[in-house]
């Protein structure tokens, strides 16, 4: 909006009206700016609420630009002055009130996000693709932060570190989840394509074998692992979930082994895990090839579950996995599930 080109002018025409209107409704419709932001995010699928966007733009800059164009400045925008609508204080998030004070942003019980967990803390481990956080109660959180949370060797490095942290006794359980729209869109195919094109086959072998060993270290470790999924969990992302002891899935989780669509096959244990699950189900198709035919049908057509419930029907979720309806509760529910698994935990048989 600072630029005088067509894009800048259009953005200003839209946001100047939208954001100033939202600000002008305080305190008419609510005295709490958090309610406005939540309403726009939950009701209209905005990534950020009006006051969160104003903080990114700078409230004082926005107010000055309104004045320079002869537009009215909402009272709360004048009141905040050179400050921000949201500030971090004492490891908590506070919001600006109509009285000019800052008070803590309260959340309903059971709401938990990575931003809540990480506020005022430093990660236990980080690289460009993954961060490890202390969730409290001796539970470790692995957060994917790559583009679309795609899985690359750096994520496998981070998951190996998470396994080491838990095996050493520093943590008693692991949750894998994030605040993003998607759990993981799968393996980083751009990287895989590049190393194939340059003929670095040793690197391909390392990527495949490293992924297998890492996921097996999670599946057969001495600690419980819970996958907190939402949105897309495709290919390698699906295989990460299949390696977990439990999956705490948001109802709108779309799971599938889609590798065939790009000319490869699942390489990190997905085929083996699906065969194990379908073969163990007494309701599966009978005969020596019954389960195999069903698996080939799903893998060969790169079928993706359209919901968590369908994922259960397709055996991506087991009967012991759980479904959470509210996205904001997924991480908390996953943590609670992990805590419940700790006492008397024993890893699956090594042959699984």
Where are the predicted features?
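N-terminal glycine-rich phosphate-binding loop for ADP-containing cofactors
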Residues: 1-181, 190-223, 230-233, 237, ...
